[in-house]
Regions:
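Short, conserved, GDST-rich strand-edge loop motifs in beta-rich repeat architectures
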Residues: 50-57, 156-164, 211-224, 339-362, ...
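Repeated scaffold domains used in trafficking and secretory/extracellular systems
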Residues: 30-37, 84-92, 134-144, 190-198, ...
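Loop/turn-rich, solvent-exposed surfaces of beta-rich toroidal or solenoidal domains
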Residues: 334-342, 366, 395-450
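Post-signal peptide N-terminal segment of secreted/secretory-pathway proteins
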Residues: 32, 39-42, 46-145
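Beta-propeller blade signature
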Residues: 61-67, 114-120, 166-176, 222-236, ...
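Bacterial Sec-dependent N-terminal signal peptides
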Residues: 1-23, 495
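Conserved blade-ending motifs and adjacent loop-strand segments that build the rim/top face
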Residues: 243-252, 291-305, 383-400, 447-472
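Short beta-strand elements that form the blades of beta-propeller/WD-repeat-like
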Residues: 43-56, 98-105, 149-160, 205-214, ...
Length: 495
């Protein structure tokens, strides 16, 4: 009895220590509102909001500034320069406790990059930072990332002199206003790049992950997709394109751990494979997880068991696996958070006068998998959490998740408990699309579930709020943006 008392006391202490506190900072109902930027400086929180189809198509652009939980400032953002149609939105950054808005203007065959600074809640004059000599700039699809000390702009240009396509990148150091321009030849005149992520180290290396679409010569409508890593070394002015391992010409996810290493999700014969790539060691690849090798292969009739009643995971349980986040722990171990969903048809017997059965095919089974890999790449543990998922009439699916790191644990936020889903005899029933939901959080580590907690009230929200973005304020606080069509809500959570 005494041991039971101490055990319950321990569980109570763990539950309290893992509690998540949510406070709503701001919410707005407008069908065209979007949050483009969230940043923090000291105790102040900066947000850039827009109303309209594009950032420069409407004058209704606002900067919101909070001090802790108090809204200090809301004002329009006058960042237009001459003709709005010539402008491209780059990025907002907080530099030296000031909010900088970067954007570019195309002038003939060049792109001019500007910056406007918010000083004492007033916007200063636009300053021309640099001019990028992109050839035939009208064909360039510029995209932008930020690194530790630099603004990183990149795109594909057509070099008429060499008759080739080139990848080009601009690295602008906004502390010294120095710039570096890199170009590397692409292997095909019809090649294109779909950029996914960029990251830098504290020295002079920048790595960009992209999917390289190379159209086949015999059929220009069919493209081969090749994942590539583009490594820029500022110190030696080098630009190197590295071909990564590609299975079935499909690289569905790439995540940079640092400037030398990445996690990839490929598919082999339709099944997912999670691999680890080292750029500095001859592009070596190490398979971390392969569902066909790690799970028993079962017959179709064996698989058709109600999932909630079985503990064994079969190969089909991983067919639609998608990576949401990757976390590198202090001991160099790796935590990978995935989601898995597939359509199911649920049939209900109706208590109508004429009887009959009605089937709903918009239910999905939605699972969250959390994989834990040792520093050597060995699978240490895997946790699985099941939730219902429903398609809804606003162009998306019901569930959405975002992830944060809490020491060596993972905090997962998602929307849960639709107002008109009823669980009866262990089965889900519904008569219409879900109308509302609550934000929910779980905290997990390699030992399993530590905490499960509701963060909002469906009666107050009266909408399906999907968590979309997160932003760390510090090691113990983060901002969360949740939205559904005509409403967005920004909350601060203590982790």
């Amino acid at each position: 009895m005494k041991k039971l008392f101490f055990f319950l006391q321990f569980l109570f202490h763990v539950s309290l220590s893992q509690e998540i506190n949510w406070s709503t900072l701001y919410e707005q109902e407008n069908s065209t509102s979007k949050i483009n930027f969230i940043g923090t400086s000291n105790s102040e929180i900066f947000m850039l909001s827009q109303e309209g189809k594009g950032l420069f198509s409407s004058t209704k652009k606002y900067v919101l500034i909070f001090d802790n939980n108090t809204l200090l400032f809301k004002n329009k953002v006058p960042i237009e320069i001459e003709n709005n149609n010539q402008l491209t939105y780059l990025k907002c950054l907080i530099i030296n406790n000031q909010l900088h808005a970067f954007y570019s203007k195309q002038v003939q065959e060049k792109s001019e990059i500007y910056s406007k600074i918010l000083i004492d809640q007033k916007w200063g004059e636009a300053k021309l930072l640099c001019t990028v000599p992109f050839i035939e700039s009208s064909q360039i699809n510029l995209k932008y990332f930020t690194t530790i000390n630099s603004l990183f702009a990149f795109g594909v240009r057509k070099n008429e002199l060499k008759k080739i396509n080139e990848f080009c990148a601009l690295v602008l150091n906004y502390n010294s206003n120095s710039e570096h321009i890199f170009c590397a030849e692409l292997n095909s005149e019809n090649a294109n790049l779909d950029f996914t992520e960029a990251q830098s180290d504290t020295c002079c290396n920048i790595v960009l992950l992209a999917n390289y679409f190379q159209k086949k010569s015999f059929n220009l409508n069919v493209a081969i997709e090749i994942p590539v890593a583009i490594k820029l070394t500022i110190k030696n002015s080098e630009c190197k394109i590295i071909n990564l391992k590609s299975l079935d010409a499909s690289n569905e996810f790439s995540y940079l751990i640092n400037s030398n290493q990445a996690i990839l999700l490929n598919r082999e014969n339709g099944m997912p494979e999670i691999s680890f790539v080292n750029f500095d060691n001859d592009n070596t690849s190490q398979v971390l997880f392969n569902s066909s090798n790690s799970q028993p292969t079962e017959k179709e009739e064996d698989y058709a068991i109600e999932k909630s009643s079985r503990n064994t995971l079969y190969e089909k349980d991983f067919k639609n696996l998608k990576i949401k986040n990757v976390f590198r722990q202090k001991d160099s171990s790796i935590t990978v958070v995935c989601e898995q969903s597939w359509k199911e048809q649920i049939c209900n017997t109706l208590n109508y006068r004429f009887g009959g059965v009605q089937c709903f095919d918009y239910f999905y089974s939605w699972d969250v998998f959390v994989f834990y890999f040792s520093p050597k790449g060995e699978l240490q543990n895997m946790n699985r959490f099941q939730k219902p998922q429903v398609t809804i009439d606003d162009g998306g699916v019901y569930n959405s998740i975002v992830c944060l790191q809490k020491n060596n644990d993972v905090l997962i936020l998602y929307n849960n408990e639709p107002s008109n889903l009823i669980r009866k005899s262990g089965k889900l029933k519904t008569m219409m699309y879900p109308m509302s939901s609550v934000l929910h959080s779980i905290i997990v580590n390699k030992n399993g579930l530590l905490n499960s907690q509701r963060l909002s009230n469906p009666k107050e929200d009266n909408a399906i709020l999907r968590p979309l973005k997160t932003h760390y304020i510090n090691s113990s606080e983060a901002l969360v943006l949740a939205t559904k069509n005509n409403k967005f809500k920004i909350g601060k959570i203590k982790i």
